[in-house]
Amino acid sequence: MRKVSYLFWLTALLGLGLVACAPAAAPEGGPLQEVGEGEGSLSIVAWAGYIERGVTDPGFDWVTDFEAATGCLVQDKVAATSDEMVALMTEGGFDLVTASGDASNRLISAGLVQEINLDLIPSYNTVDERLKNAPWHTVDRDGDGTAEHYGVPYQWGSNVLMYNTEVFTEPPTSWNVVFEETTLPDGQSNAGRIEAYDGPIYIADAALYLMYHNPELGIQDPYELTRDQFNAALDLLRVQRGLVNRYWHDVVLQVDDFTNEGVVASSSWPYQVNLLAVDQPVSSVITVEGATGWADTTMMHTNAPHPNCAYKWLEHSLNTQLQGDLAYWFGSVPSVPAACDTNEMLGPTGCDVNGLGNFEQISFWKTPSAACGFDPAGDAGPNDCVPYHEWVTNMIAVIGGR
């Protein structure tokens, strides 16, 4: 049974519309210059599993000690997709958001997040050099030749191919098991036994697959697609639609589908893999085509109601204990490499298992825009790529059977 929340998509579209017309304003007076006494509260929009206080599992809690040390009581709002995060930040009332690259630049350009004063975050110098000045959270908005920072790296990782190890006695080598009808190793078709992510950014997964298998399309970046390349990705997704059991964005539902509904292969996050692998025959792999992925940044709302508590959390978020525990819990890679060396849960090989060496294989999420960063075949101009709002409307159409 295919299920889609059209109310969710309506919310996402409204968020996009509001973002398009929101003023690109900075907080009055610029970034905070000194961290003062906490305001007593802190609200964070986050991915599932990112803000843990020992409720899901008593062994994973990086909130309670922070609250005791700062007096800042943490409330978190779980968002299922980047579009939901943008919509919530547009609505306002939140302090921080753990934004992926397909949301972070939209938040910056819309003026919904503020520049961060790195002088107030002493642990920033411990961040992975590959992430410190990444383009998904640094922008030279004032044109002075120096990029401003709009967030603090949190965790990164890949969108993996999760599979049932009783069906696949050997790891799948290609994403074809979820994109094209095929007979699986157990002798049965994959039709009705796979899932796909329902976010518009998933079009990039189809483009990445075509980039490997159809090089004549000239795809160089799965987020920078000319009209013909974009249409080819949509055609592949329409084929996939006939195979999909469910389009997922709710991690709990996906866990249940692999446990009880006969789903045996899907794009997923390491978080679901870790939850399922405790008592289900589940594993994951990055295939020959590579994978899309996320590098998440904690960003601060322009009108954050609790800025002092927010800065205290930004510093706390880089604590090696938090970074390592979260990486073990979520199946991600810490933004602070030292966490890989000192965390008991991760052990000496935990970061390697979670994909520390896969950085170059990952096409990290970013917001598609009309401006291309290349000139494929010499005939696609600098503004000939399909912008994100068309990714949204076309993904809705694909899911709806059009």
Where are these regions (language model features)?
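Conserved C-terminal helix/tail region of periplasmic/extracytoplasmic solute-binding proteins
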Residues: 256, 362-402
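Mature extracytoplasmic/periplasmic domains
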Residues: 296, 301-370
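Periplasmic-binding protein-like
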Residues: 123-126, 234-240, 278-302, 347, ...
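Extracytoplasmic ligand-binding site segments that recognize negatively charged/polar headgroups
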Residues: 43-58, 93, 98-253
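Short, low-complexity disordered leader/linker segments with a strong preference
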Residues: 1-42, 402
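Paired acidic/hydrophobic, glycine-rich loop segments that form the ligand-binding mouth/hinge
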Residues: 95-99, 247, 264-269, 284
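Early extracytoplasmic/lumenal segment of secretory-pathway proteins
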Residues: 29-110
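A ligand-binding cleft/hinge motif common to bilobed small-molecule-binding domains
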Residues: 103-106, 267-281
